[in-house]
């Protein structure tokens, strides 16, 4: 009958499936009041102590900071962190943090100055006059986060609740063994906790406020009832001790009978839950104006001489707290951050205390039992019976081990609260929670990669669409900016295009010549004749210019005559070289000799005509004669070298000798004409006479060597000798005259 009446009572409670009853081990630490810990010399404050992104730094190395001074800026979901004491920022660098793998995260390292000075604190005792938005912003900027273990920013959680929250639940269950931080906080600070609950209720305006606490905390229950004696707006619900009654979904079901849907949140059913420690931090932030710089931490385990609960500054090294509590480590000492079921072993003791650190457990070697070897799953289903989330841990174990992420997701692995109840009851000692944590991390990484790929695809498609729009707009501008030509311009353009097309058609049209017909090349012939006539006219003008220049300058005329004679001799050599085996025609040679003599006479006449205008310098004439004689000698040598095997024609040699003698006479006449004005040096004349005699003798020797096989005509030889003797006599007479 009593059970029937209790079912209709207003404070009815429900029970969830599964759960376990491990040894509580709470009496080690809940019997002593909260105490302060001496300040450490150095504090390490990680920038990320919550779920979400880290804040933006607002301090630099070397800055002096005070307790409560912001070290980062909280924008959006980024929660700021604050200096736990006054001191100097000595470094901003990665440091190992509270993580199973001791991952390094960016941290601010502060050396304490020992003064522990606060920033100016501005409390809002009249918080009821403040708006909801102002209170949420203050809570957020003062760094308040969920202190029950999740670390979700409280301001963001309150903002997301909105006006749809009907029930505010304060979680005071603290169901995990060894942990007594909330129990001791409620015993020592019950009034402040209730005041923080009222601030949360003022922000959310719920229909009911429930405090859920397990029946294994009688002192805390007594203190809360004493504070709530005159209050009807807050209801205290004492629930049976069962692990994990402190889970958000489990406690919600116990107090309201409502189940949070798979993949959903408690706010979907009009429920919002906050921890006891969070309510206390809200009170200190709003009323006292103090950012969260410390929290209650349980120090327990048989390896600690003075177990209890302490106010630990955030950023304090774990080693400092344990040493203050009389830590006596063994050879293979293990230190667990958190409880024995949901906590993790610290790889080393220099990691700092953060906002989610609620317990430091240092058990002795035999306190938690000997670690046993993992064995194969026997499919006993004991884990499924103990699971408070109604999951199938054995199936999730196989899926996690086989990397079957889709099947693990289908079996709601995301609903696992990692309470460790399945691993506690497993007879094969399988660390199921470790497999589930790893699998959830891999699934989260895959989803994050898919999200980045989708965002990249969206950015690419948006960029392509933007480029297409810009291209279309650019083409439209070009079309609108194009100027349409007038009618007259259109006709001119059309005519020009027609001419171009006609020329292209003519150029590409092949020339076809029918059989028996002659091509009409009259145009080409006429153009060629015109070009020839133009060239002849230019040549005639050039010749007239050259003739006028030659008549005006007797020296140039003499040079041209010498060039002509050299060309004649070169032509004779080329003909001799081109016909080595052919007999020279004597008639042709005589004709060429006559032509050469005619050219020589013509040049002499030109010189004679030019002489009246300008008197020739006898010295220059002598130099030119010497040059002519040198050229004659060089030509004779070239002829001798070019025709070593060829029989020399005696007639041709006689002609050349006659030409040479004529040149000599011509030079002598020029010298005689030049003598009246200038006396010739007798020594030079004697030298020239000797040179002439030597040349004559050399010519006779060449003729003798060139005609070894042919009989020399005695008459011609006698004539040549007489001529040579006459030249010698004449030179001697000239020498005598010069000497007189």
Swiss-Prot record:
The complex is composed of six subunits: RsxA, RsxB, RsxC, RsxD, RsxE and RsxG. This is Ion-translocating oxidoreductase complex subunit C. Pfam families: Complex1_51K, Fer4_7, RnfC_N, SLBB. GO terms for biological process: electron transport chain. The gene is rsxC. One of its GO terms (molecular function) is metal ion binding. [4Fe-4S] cluster 2 binds at residues 387, 416, 419, 422. [4Fe-4S] cluster 1 binds at residues 377, 380, 383, 426. Belongs to the 4Fe4S bacterial-type ferredoxin family. RnfC subfamily. It comes from Shigella sonnei (strain Ss046). HAMAP family: RsxC_RnfC (MF_00461). Residues 369-397, 407-436 form the 4Fe-4S ferredoxin-type domain.
């Amino acid at each position: 009958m009593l059970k029937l009446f209790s079912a209709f009572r207003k404070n009815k409670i429900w029970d969830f499936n599964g759960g376990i009853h491990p040894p509580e081990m709470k009496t080690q630490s809940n019997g002593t009041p909260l105490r302060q810990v001496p300040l450490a010399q150095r504090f390490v404050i990680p920038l990320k102590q919550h779920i979400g992104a880290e804040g933006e730094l607002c301090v630099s190395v070397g800055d002096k900071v005070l307790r409560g001074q912001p070290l980062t800026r909280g924008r959006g979901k980024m929660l700021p962190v604050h200096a736990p004491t006054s001191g100097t920022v000595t470094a901003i660098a990665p440091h190992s943090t509270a993580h199973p793998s001791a991952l390094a995260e960016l941290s601010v390292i502060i050396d304490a100055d020992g003064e522990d000075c606060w920033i100016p604190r501005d409390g809002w005792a009249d918080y009821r006059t403040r708006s909801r938005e102002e209170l949420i912003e203050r809570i957020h900027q003062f760094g308040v986060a969920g202190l029950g273990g999740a670390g979700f920013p409280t301001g963001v959680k309150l903002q997301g609740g909105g006006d749809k929250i009907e029930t505010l639940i304060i979680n005071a269950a603290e169901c995990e063994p060894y942990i007594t931080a909330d129990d001791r906080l409620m015993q020592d600070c019950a009034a402040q906790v209730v005041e923080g609950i009222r601030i949360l209720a003022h922000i959310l305006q719920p229909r009911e406020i429930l405090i859920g606490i397990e029946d294994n905390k009688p002192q805390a229950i007594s203190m809360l009832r004493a504070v709530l004696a005159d209050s009807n707006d807050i209801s205290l619900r004492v629930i049976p001790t069962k692990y994990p009654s402190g889970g958000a979904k489990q406690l919600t079901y116990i107090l309201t009978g409502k189940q949070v849907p798979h993949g959903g949140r408690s706010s979907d059913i009009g429920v919002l839950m906050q921890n006891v420690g969070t309510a206390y931090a809200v009170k200190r932030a709003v009323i006292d104006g103090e950012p969260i710089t410390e929290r209650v931490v349980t120090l327990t385990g048989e390896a600690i001489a003075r177990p209890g609960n302490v106010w630990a500054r955030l950023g304090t090294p774990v080693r400092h707290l344990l040493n203050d509590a009389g830590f006596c480590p063994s050879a293979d000492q293990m230190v667990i951050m958190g409880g024995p079921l949901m906590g993790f072993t610290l790889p080393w003791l220099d990691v700092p205390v953060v906002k989610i650190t609620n317990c430091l457990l240092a058990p002795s070697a035999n306190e938690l039992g000997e670690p046993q070897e993992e064995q194969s799953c026997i499919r006993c289903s004991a884990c499924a019976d103990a699971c408070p989330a109604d999951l199938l841990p054995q199936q999730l174990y196989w899926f996690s081990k086989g990397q079957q992420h889709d099947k693990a997701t289908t079996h709601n692995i995301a609903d696992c609260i990692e309470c460790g109840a399945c691993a506690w009851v497993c007879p094969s000692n399988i660390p199921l929670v470790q497999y589930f944590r790893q699998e959830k991390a891999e699934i989260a990484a895959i989803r994050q990669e898919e999200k980045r790929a989708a965002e990249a695809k969206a950015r690419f498609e948006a960029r392509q669409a933007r480029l297409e729009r810009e291209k279309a707009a650019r083409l439209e501008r070009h079309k609108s900016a194009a100027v349409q030509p007038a009618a007259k311009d259109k006709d001119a353009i059309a005519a020009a295009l027609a001419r171009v097309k006609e020329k292209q058609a003519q150029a590409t049209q092949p020339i076809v010549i029918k059989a028996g017909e002659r091509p009409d090349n009259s145009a080409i012939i006429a153009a060629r004749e015109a070009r020839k006539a133009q060239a002849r006219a230019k040549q005639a003008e050039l010749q007239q210019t050259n003739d006028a220049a030659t008549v005006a300058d007797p020296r140039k005329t003499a040079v041209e005559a010498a060039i002509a004679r050299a060309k004649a001799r070169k032509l004779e050599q080329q003909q001799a070289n081109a016909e080595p085996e052919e007999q020279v025609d004597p008639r042709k040679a005589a004709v060429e000799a006559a032509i050469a003599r005619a050219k020589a006479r013509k040049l002499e006449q030109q010189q004679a005509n030019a002489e009246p205008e300008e008197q020739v310098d006898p010295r220059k004439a002598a130099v030119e004669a010497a040059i002519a004689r040198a050229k004659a000698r060089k030509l004779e040598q070239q002829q001798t070298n070019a025709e070593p095997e060829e029989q020399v024609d005696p007639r041709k040699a006689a002609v050349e000798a006659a030409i040479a003698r004529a040149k000599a006479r011509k030079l002598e006449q020029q010298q005689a004409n030049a003598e009246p004005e200038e006396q010739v040096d007798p020594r030079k004349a004697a030298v020239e006479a000797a040179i002439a005699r030597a040349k004559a003798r050399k010519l006779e020797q060449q003729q003798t060597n060139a005609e070894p096989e042919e009989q020399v005509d005695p008459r011609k030889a006698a004539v040549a000798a007489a001529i040579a003797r006459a030249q010698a006599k004449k030179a001697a007479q000239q020498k005598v005259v010069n000497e007189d």
